[in-house]
Design a protein with these regions (language model features):
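Long, charged, low-complexity intrinsically disordered regions
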Residues: 1-74
Length: 74
């Protein structure tokens, strides 16, 4: 599993950082956790990019306790 920690990243830098992360791992079947913290704006930026790449994702863990990350497979 790969992790991208966007916590404390300025929103303007999230999109290019995430795109670079995705493209470096494209079609490798890598499970990835994208750490967003609890910022709704940060999550919205990440989800928009994941949608553009048509990647399935889940926000947080199954129990709904930790909602500060987004899980996907690249």
């Amino acid at each position: 599993m790969d992790k991208l920690d966007l916590h404390h990243t300025r929103h303007e830098f999230v999109r290019p950082k995430l795109i670079r992360f995705i493209e470096d791992r494209w079609n490798k079947g890598v499970e990835a956790h994208i750490i967003t913290g609890h910022s709704d704006e940060m999550k919205a930026i990440v989800i928009k990019v994941l949608d553009e790449y048509k990647l399935e994702y889940r926000v947080g863990d199954f129990a709904g306790i930790n909602m500060g990350f987004i899980k996907t497979e690249i």
